[in-house]
From Swiss-Prot:
It comes from Bacillus anthracis. Its cofactor is FAD. This is UDP-N-acetylenolpyruvoylglucosamine reductase 1. It is an enzyme of class 1 (oxidoreductase). Belongs to the MurB family.
Length: 301
C-alpha cells in the first residue's frame, strides 16, 4: 500500500490522503477511514489513479458529495476517489447544458433556473453531485435525471472513456446501467432543457425547496431517503403507520418529520443506522407483508 501511495503522489493525481476519515465527506457525518483517499485535480488524475489501482490489484470506490451514502464504521478498503473540484466545469449553449460530474446539483439547478432554463426544478433540494445523480437516476417531485439527460461521458473500469446515450444508460427507478452491468465514473453529463419563463421556473424551484424544508429533516445530518418507495406504497407512510416514527438506536433516529429519513442526532455509528434499517425492514414485512429495499447506498468493509 505504501508503494501505491508513493506512486500516486509522484504521478500528481491530486490530493492523496492516507487513513482519511470519511465521516467529513458524507452528509450523514458517519464513516470510518479510507485506506487512500484521492481528490483528483482533473480527468487525467482519475485515469492515472485507475491505471495504478489496476497495476496493484487494489479495490477502488468512487464517491461524490457524499449524499445518499452510508459508509461502514470500518471504512473503505483500497482507494476512494472523491469527485469534486477537478470535475466542476459548466458549458451552457441555448438549452443544451454540458456539466462536469463533480458539479453540485443544487447549485446547477439554481443557476439554470435564473437563466430561464426549465427541467431541473426537481433537483432544487437534492444535495449531491451531477455524477452521483446520473449514476443513481436521482429524482424528486415526479421527475428525475432520466427526463433530461441526453448522454453521459463515462470512465469505465478498464480505463476506456466513452459516451453512453440515454438509451444505453438503461435508466429505471433510482438505477442505471452504471450500478449493474457497466460500472464506471460519470465524468460529464449533457442535459437537454427547455427555454421557459424565468419567473415561473424560479417560483417552482422555491416551492420545491419550501416543501423539502417543511417536510424533511435537513437541519440534521442525514443521507436523504433511506428506502425506495415499494409501489404502490410510499416508504415513509408505511414506516409511520408501523409506529416507528421517532424510534432511536444509539445516535441514529427515524425522523419525527418524515419516516423515510434516518438522522444522526450526534455520534451515531453506521451500525446504529444499519440496526434501524434492519428493524424497519422486519417490522414492515411483519405488519404489511411488504419487502423494503434501500435507496441509500451502503458501502465499506
Amino acid at each position: 500500500m505504501e508503494q501505491l501511495v508513493n506512486e500516486l503522489i509522484q504521478a500528481n493525481v491530486g490530493r492523496v490522503l492516507v487513513d482519511e476519515p470519511l465521516a467529513r465527506y458524507t452528509t450523514m457525518k458517519i464513516g470510518g477511514p479510507a485506506d487512500i483517499l484521492i481528490v483528483p485535480k482533473r480527468v487525467a488524475g482519475i485515469e492515472k489513479t485507475l491505471q495504478l489501482v489496476k497495476k496493484y490489484k487494489t479495490k477502488w470506490t468512487v464517491i461524490g458529495r457524499g449524499s445518499n451514502l452510508l459508509v461502514s464504521d470500518l471504512g473503505i478498503e483500497g482507494v476512494v476517489i472523491r469527485l469534486g473540484e477537478g470535475l466542476d466545469h459548466l458549458e451552457v449553449e441555448k438549452h443544451r447544458v454540458r456539466v462536469g460530474g463533480g458539479y453540485p446539483l443544487i447549485k446547477l439547478s439554481t443557476l439554470l433556473s435564473r437563466q430561464g432554463l426549465a427541467g431541473l426544478e426537481f433537483a432544487s433540494g437534492i444535495p449531491g453531485s451531477v455524477g452521483g445523480a446520473v449514476y443513481m437516476n436521482a429524482g424528486a417531485h415526479k421527475s428525475d435525471i432520466s427526463n433530461i439527460l441526453s448522454k453521459a461521458l463515462i470512465l469505465f473500469e478498464d480505463g476506456t472513456i466513452d459516451w453512453l446515450t440515454h438509451g444505453e444508460m438503461e435508466f429505471s427507478y433510482r438505477t442505471s446501467v452504471l450500478q449493474t452491468k457497466r460500472p464506471g465514473i460519470v465524468l460529464e453529463a449533457e442535459f437537454q432543457l427547455q427555454i421557459g419563463e424565468r419567473e415561473r421556473i424560479v417560483s417552482v424551484m422555491q416551492k420545491n425547496k419550501d416543501y423539502r424544508r417543511e417536510t424533511q429533516p435537513w437541519n440534521h445530518p442525514c443521507a436523504g431517503s433511506v428506502f425506495r418507495n415499494p409501489t404502490p406504497y410510499f416508504a415513509g407512510d408505511l414506516i409511520e403507520k408501523a409506529g416507528l416514527r421517532g424510534y432511536q438506536i444509539g445516535g441514529a433516529q427515524i425522523s419525527e418529520m418524515h419516516g423515510n429519513f434516518i438522522i444522526n442526532t450526534g455520534g451515531a455509528s453506521a451500525q446504529d443506522v444499519l440496526s434501524l434499517i434492519a428493524l424497519i425492514k422486519q417490522t414492515i414485512k411483519d405488519k404489511f407483508g411488504v419487502e423494503m429495499h434501500t435507496e441509500v447506498e451502503i458501502i465499506g468493509r
